[in-house]
Amino acid sequence: MGKIQLLDDLTIQKIAAGEVIERPASIVKELVENSIDANSKNIVIEINNGGKSYIRVTDDGDGIALDDIYLAFESHSTSKLRKVDDLYNLLTLGFRGEALPSIAAVSNIEVLTKTDDTNAGIHAIIEEGKIKSIDKVGTPKGTTFIIKDLFYNLPVRKKFLKSDLTEANKISDMVNKLALGNYYTSFKLVKDNKVVLKTNDSGDIKENVYTILGKDIANGLNPIDYSGKGIEIKGYISSNSLYRSNRSHQYLYINGRYIVNYGLTNVVEQNYRSLIPTNRYPVFILYININPNEIDVNIHPTKQEVKFTGDTDIYGILGIVIKNGLY
């Protein structure tokens, strides 16, 4: 008898979820990105016990239609792609249709949602990756996700989670990144019934930086603003008197998405080499808008890495912009 067997659906879902959902902060990221894509102006994140036992994300966005609820928890079902070419024209944060099925595979979920064109909202309960019940309820326009008992069915993964404080700090860091990148949306983060962050939707980048990163950093930043060759770069970079011992205060966004790109980070840091002490790092909050055809975000499960096509000189342009902003 052969040794190779097909995996059952639940096992497949758990394996896939492991690539997307590493910890509570992963769930917050995926749900908040969905809220942003749904045109939300106000997003509230509530967590208990570092998000291990309870995560609640509430928005005032478009809501989810009843027909879409049935598909939302099926793998690779998405409202953001229709064909493979759409991957190279992405202006949304989500696109693979993996987030909700992955979350449902490792937790229990409640959803409250209402669209603008319906009189009643929907209350859905999802357990073991499947919809158990759907009822009509009164609820405001928008969507609320309640996530409970993360990794209840993956005890080994659950054991590797850190302390409540560490996991809560990971969530704070993730919310900071999302809030800095979406300054036209207000964010509120509540940890164990205590409000720890509240931003507004003014669209003022500097005010947002002040609220999230504090007065000392906000007051030590220089503005930059460039537009040309199909690329826009704006944001703030630190003066030569403001630096940190690590890269924790470096924020880079491409088309609204927080990304990690060591090439671009190195371009920025090279301009500071003679200005700040060795083994110290500049602070920056940079927003780059570029034709989505010139980047590929579909290279990592977290969608936090990008590749550029050979048609763009983003590295050279960024270097000049940073140099001009410093001198």
Feature map (PLM): residue ranges:
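N-terminal phosphate-binding caps/lids of nucleotide- and nucleic-acid-binding domains
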Residues: 1-327
